[in-house]
Amino acid sequence: LKEIVRLANERAVPVIVDAAAELPPVCNLQSFLSEGADLVIFSGGKAMCGPNDTGILCGRADLIKAARAQAFPNAGIGRALKVSKEQIIGLIYALQRFIKIDWNSEQLRWEKVCEKILHRLKSINCTNISIAYATHGARPLIVPRVCLTIDPIMLGKDLSQIDHQLERGKPAIAVVMD
């Protein structure tokens, strides 16, 4: 981000960070602005657990004012995207709750869940099974995932059959195939 900010600043172009899925950790509420972003957009849904059609726009006052000019009660392009008073109250409550969560404890809880899953899956014919953190793509980065490397030949099924069987299970399991 720092390199993008440097290049954008040389050209007087504002940097807008789509941080919709960058929570947790809570420190991300400030980190992108600290690194020089001009605007940062967070989802009010997702990990914040507020109303799904809400969000938080943070950043430079002049850019916030320009965005606000597009919203209710004005007739800008954002008029159709207004949120109700009830949704705003829900978002405020969700944000207050979100910042009070002990995310270190949550992360440990997630790791324990992953360890249980990993233990239950050890009987599957796979070439590798581990707990890992995403380095790209999947968000948020602090959420651990159970990673399996499956050899379809060893299982006697192709990847689409495996995916289909997992999706139809109880509970359903969504997979990302690389």
Segment roles from a protein language model:
Residues 1-103, 118-122:
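Conserved PLP-enzyme active-site core in the AAT-like
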Residues 99-124, 129-133:
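Active-site-lining helix/loop region of Rossmann-like oxidoreductase modules
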Residues 122-178:
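Conserved C-terminal alpha-helix-loop-beta "cap" of PLP-dependent enzymes
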Residues 20-21, 109, 154:
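Residues that cap or flank secondary-structure elements
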